[in-house]
Amino acid sequence: MATIEDLLEEVGRPYQMFNEDGTYQGCFYPVQFLYPDKPRYNMPSEDIEKNYLYGLARIKKHCVEIQPEELQKGDIIVTRFRDELHVAVYYEFSKIIHVFKDHTLQLGRLKLFKEYKCFRVKE
């Protein structure tokens, strides 16, 4: 299984919006990289609100919600960014690994988001 350090080595590399099987990858890329045994998500609609609710429901199915002060490496951050679902992986010291500009994996700061939910993947 990949580690958070393996994911960190991917920072700066471009990614594809869709997996080889046609399922949506987008900003889920870091989550799918770390947790390849979890189901992939195929966004059902072009409706931003429906996709946000669908993506959040899928994450809740495989994760348990935690408080921000409980965050550990590999936990998942879910937020709205420009009214769309955005997913990131917590690294450490308020840093996150996520897909952002230019379709590349980037190291960013959690304070970029005003509101977010935190999740830990169920074993």
PLM regions and their residue ranges:
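N-terminal capping segments
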Residues: M1-H62, K73, F81-L85, K122
